[in-house]
């Protein structure tokens, strides 16, 4: 942990996944690990608050990057484009997140603009977790 080395004040951001906020079949180990991120984030937010260290988590939906393209092909070899289309259709904004979308959310949580926010899960998911 970095927290013992932090002076009083600061921000810790845990990157998780929308899987940490929901459940779905055939992914229990992955979903369990992402829900664990939420639990440790909330515990640390409570523990670190007296030192004015804020702890939050971001939960991206699928992100348009090389890793996701590899996963799409892994889900259905030769049908990656169809997998992507199906996943995008499950997102109300009808697109994957971008790396920049996630970076901007992290930047906000790290900034003084969020100085009174701790212990929250920020879904960066185009509405995926609300439907």
Predicted regions and their residues:
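Alpha-helical segment proximal to the catalytic Tyr-Lys
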Residues: 4, 46-50, 115
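Hydrophobic structural elements of the Rossmann-like NAD(P)H-binding subdomain
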Residues: 13, 55-58, 68, 119, ...
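Residue(s) in the substrate-gating loop at a strand-loop-helix junction
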Residues: 17
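Short C-terminal tail/terminal secondary-structure segment
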Residues: 22, 106-107, 118-131
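Active-site loop immediately N-terminal to the catalytic Tyr-X3-Lys motif
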Residues: 22-28, 50-51, 94, 112
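Active-site helix of classical SDR
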Residues: 33, 41
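Short, flexible catalytic-loop segment of classical short-chain dehydrogenase/reductase
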Residues: 38, 55, 60-74
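A conserved structural motif in NAD(P)-dependent oxidoreductases
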Residues: 78-79, 91-102, 113
């Amino acid at each position: 942990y970095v927290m013992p080395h932090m002076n009083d004040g600061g921000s810790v951001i845990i990157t998780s996944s929308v899987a940490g906020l929901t459940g779905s079949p055939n992914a229990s180990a992955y979903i369990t690990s992402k829900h664990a991120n939420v639990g440790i984030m909330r515990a640390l937010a409570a523990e670190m608050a007296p030192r004015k260290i804020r702890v939050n988590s971001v939960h991206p939906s699928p992100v348009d990057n090389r890793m996701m393209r590899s996963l799409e092909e892994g889900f259905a070899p030769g049908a990656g484009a169809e997998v992507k289309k199906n996943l995008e259709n499950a997102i109300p904004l009808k697109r994957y997140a971008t790396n920049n979308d996630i970076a901007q959310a992290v930047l906000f949580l790290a900034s003084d603009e969020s100085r009174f926010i701790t212990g929250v899960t920020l879904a960066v998911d185009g509405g995926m977790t609300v439907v």
